[in-house]
Amino acid sequence: MSSGGLLLLLGLLTLWAELTPVSSKDHPEFCELPADSGPCRGILHAFYYHPVHRTCLEFIYGGCYGNANNFKTIDECEPPCAA
């Protein structure tokens, strides 16, 4: 393979590594779920783990259903997901 081809391959692998979410081996699978406000119309401040940003972010939760990536406080979100 030419040096240009190797450089391209290295660049693509680097890009893939940066854009791929953290492996679920580092935290539970529910941490990979998107924020889900659910079908209800409440306005509750909640937190979810954002795998690309690798941090817990605030969102508005409707009050019912949603998914497991939903925490009442940032202190509840960080230990299982951001650790």
Curated annotation (Swiss-Prot):
Expressed by the venom gland. It comes from the Eukaryota. The keyword Disulfide bond applies. SMART domains: KU. One of its GO terms (cellular component) is extracellular space. Its main location: secreted. Keywords: Disulfide bond, Protease inhibitor, Secreted, Serine protease inhibitor, Signal. SUPFAM superfamilies: BPTI-like (SSF57362). It holds the Pfam family Kunitz_BPTI. This is Kunitz-type serine protease inhibitor tigerin-2. It comes from Notechis scutatus scutatus.
